[in-house]
């Protein structure tokens, strides 16, 4: 078969979707007999699952009984007097955006993603955090929210409030660009070199799509990368012990 298979190109970025997260959540609550209970105003995406596991194993969190997502559970914990909802293992751009859409439809005002990432350019000795201010759109999900462009970005008002507070943390948090990919096992030498050449300092799988959602919908989303390894040299990931300082920063900024 040699014929080209064209991708759909009829994208109207201002048109409303026929399939809405609120409708799915309503049906999930009906089918599963769940209460119509809003989620905390601040919610955290935990792609690696370490934070949720930490809350479960230490008794510092409890399950949210009204979270109606078919694919995930939510743990709720108290951080500096504020309830925070944690959703684990929404890995990759499509899944992360699906869950983020459902979080906002369920009452969230701020969604934070903290994911482990591979270091492309050394900014400090790992482990350290990167506040992702721009993400290279090398994934497919963002194209359903915004017209094609190289980068998607942290909302400007959030960047302006967060950056001044970064200097007060013991754990290094550095503002920098990332490369968002859909295919971690296709990070070839040429692809890595290209990403580095245009300024990406780390590689992860969610930020570009989450920031596209934020821009398209006028939502508050912050993406942090926890730099735990260099490319092709994977170390043990330890996020749970260090997540609290970053979340506290976000809550008080």
Predicted feature residues:
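Accessory terminal and edge-of-domain segments that mediate assembly/interaction
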Residues: 1-112, 118-253
């Amino acid at each position: 078969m040699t014929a080209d298979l064209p991708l759909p190109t009829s994208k109207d970025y201002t048109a409303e979707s026929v399939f809405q997260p609120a409708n799915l959540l309503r049906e999930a609550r009906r089918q599963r007999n769940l209460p119509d209970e809003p989620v905390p105003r601040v919610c955290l995406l935990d792609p690696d699952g370490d934070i949720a596991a930490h809350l479960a194993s230490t008794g510092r969190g409890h399950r949210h009984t009204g979270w109606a997502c078919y694919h995930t559970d939510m743990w709720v914990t108290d951080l500096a007097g504020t309830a925070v909802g944690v959703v684990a293992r929404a890995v990759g751009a499509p899944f992360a955006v699906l869950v983020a859409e459902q979080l906002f439809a369920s009452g969230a005002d701020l969604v934070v993603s903290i994911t482990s990432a591979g270091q492309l350019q050394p900014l400090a000795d790992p482990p350290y955090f990167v506040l992702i201010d721009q993400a290279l759109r090398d994934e497919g999900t963002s194209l359903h929210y915004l017209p094609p462009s190289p980068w998607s970005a942290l909302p400007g008002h959030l960047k302006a409030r967060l950056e001044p507070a970064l200097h007060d943390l013991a754990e290094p948090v550095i503002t920098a660009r990332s490369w968002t990919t859909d295919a971690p096992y296709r990070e070839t030498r040429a692809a890595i070199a290209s990403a580095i050449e245009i300024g990406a300092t780390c590689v992860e799988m969610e930020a570009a799509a989450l920031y596209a959602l934020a821009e398209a919908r006028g939502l508050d989303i912050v993406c942090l990368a926890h730099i735990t390894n260099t490319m092709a040299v994977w170390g043990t990931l330890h996020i749970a012990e260090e997540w609290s300082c970053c979340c506290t920063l976000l809550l008080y900024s």
